[in-house]
Amino acid sequence: MKDALLATLIDEHATIEAFASLLAYEEKALVSADGMEALPQIVEQKTTLTQRLAGLEKARDAQLAGLGLPGGRKGIEMACDGDTRIASQWALLKGSTERARRKNLTIGMMIRTRMEHNRRALAILRGETGNGAMLYGPDGRLPAFGL
């Protein structure tokens, strides 16, 4: 049973590493001028990997239960106490997960910054700056010139 648990941890680690690679592609897409076309495929792949990780976590919890251990972090930490292979793989998985978490937070901040920038630019173009002048109308035309 411990061999199956080890195999699951190895699979989780590989999946997290694949997820982290996608995050790097996502970051590049967000900062490049023509990267928006790549985002739908990246999001689709991230969704697939997230679902795979959820399945692996369930498998890990079932394997822990088969060993008479509780699920989650507590159970895996208990499994690590008696097996250096599991402890080593768990440490790798935790490290990869933390790096992916930090990268995901960075990307989230990038997206929020871009959204705020776009919101402000639209407000200026719509004349929502307090001076009452509207540069562009809702249809994208210049109302002052009838264009």
Go through the PLM ranges and name each one.
Residues 77-147:
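Short terminal interaction segments
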Residues 2-78, 88:
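Extended, charge-rich alpha-helical scaffolding segments
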